[in-house]
Each structure stands twice: as C-alpha cells, then as structure tokens.
Amino acid sequence: MTTPAPTFDNNAFTMLAALLEQWGLSSLSSDVQDMLTAGDSADIVPIKLRQTEAYKTRFAGNAQRIKNGLPALSEAEYLSTEASLRTVVRQYVGAGTYDTQDNLQKWISSDVSPQELNDRMGIYQDNWDLQPQSVKDAWASHGLTPRDALRAAMDPNVTETQLKRQAAQYSVGGAAVKAFGDDRALNADRAMDLADQGVTKDQAEKGYRDIAGRYEYEGFLARSAGMDLTLAEQEDAALLGDQRAENQRKKVINTDNARFQENYLGTQQSLSQSAAGKY
C-alpha cells in the first residue's frame, strides 16, 4: 500500500511566515515550507527552527544568558526588550552607531533592563554630554574623552556604582575647569579623592568659584609673607570644610592685615613727627 504524500498546510505556512517576520528571520521561509511539505505540524516547526544557526545567531543573547546563569527569554520578551533598549539608546545618542545588534545582545545577556540603561545614559548625559566643550577638551587632555565615558555607561561590566564614581570625578574636575577658565586646577586623582569624600557637583561648582575668585590674590599675599597656601589647602577649606586649611587662609590674611597696620601706623607716626618738627 502506498503511503499518501503529506499535504501542504497553507494556513500553517501563513502563520509561521508571520512568526518568522516578527523574529526577523524571513530567510527561513523556505525551511518552513520544506518542513511542512515533509509533514511536520505547525507545533513542531518552531521547535525545529530554534535549532537552526540562523535562529541561534538572531537570539544569541539567550545562549549567553543561560551561560550566565540567567533564564532564557521567550521570543516575545526578547524582542520587546530589544526594542526598548534600542529606543533608549536612540533617545540619547541617535541611531546607527551604538544601537547595534552586538550591543543589544550584550545588554540582554547581562540582564540590563531598559530602565537600567536609561539610568546609566542619564548619568552620562548629565555629567559628560551636557558639559561645555572646554571641560570636555580639558578632560580629554587628561585621558578621558566623552566617547570613553559613553562606552563606560554602555558597558555592563562597569557597575552603576563605578559609573557614578567616575561621573562624580568628572563633575568635580569640570567645576574646576569652568571656574578657572582652564585646566590649571584639574587633577584627575584629586578630583576622584574629593568625589570619594562626598563633594557633589553643585558643591564643587560653588567651591571652585570661590577659590578662583581669591586664588591669585591670596597666593600673592602668602608669597609676600613668605608663607605657603596651596591649591589643595584652598580646596580643603572650600570643599571639605577643613578647619586646619581654613586657619591657614586666615593666617595669611591676618598676617597681611598686620603688615598693613604696621606700615600704615608707621607712616602715620612719621608724618605726625614731621609735622610737629615744622613747628
């Protein structure tokens, strides 16, 4: 007895072709056609499709999730997460450079949610992207470019804690550049130290404005008195509330006041004596 040839299910093919289009795997349509022609049911075909290299490449993030001890996402979850991640990236840096399939797979495999990526990109925008060009140029000359910062924001291996620490360092250093108009007060290690001690962006901007406004004058007073008043001491006083550093400032100012009083009174006394001698 001859076995009847399997009949081709057009309805199943239409449904599966639509599924492939959703997955971005329309190139597998001929494979689906062959499977249905061979007698595979519409329930079996998706299982076989998941074994193809094209499918594994398209949903490569899932294989890495499993290696990382994370559960695989369903195709619908994967595609939804992918679309949301792509939207976040384009919102901040546009399309074409960073919304690549490799980056999307990297974030999905590392379980970076769209909200987490949005938070990280917000940190980048607030602390790097919106800085004036003078700050970007100054930091670039010290080895940190905006592109480096953007890559750190997008790198799931850089923890959010590390990213915030770098952002705080950048903001503190940026405040120094804006206040002085150049990078004379920019020191990467010092900026990180101040950030680690809790100096915020707003505090740094106010503190460095105060320092820049008096730096040359108080430095001149210190040199005239044969004393030291370093930038670090000015920073300690203005940004950290260090009493020892503030006392050093006051000592410089008070020494100058005493010298002024001495010179002024000496001059007045000399003038008085000269005037008395005329009579």
Indicate residue ranges for each PLM-predicted region:
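General marker for long, soluble alpha-helical cores
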Residues: T2-Y279
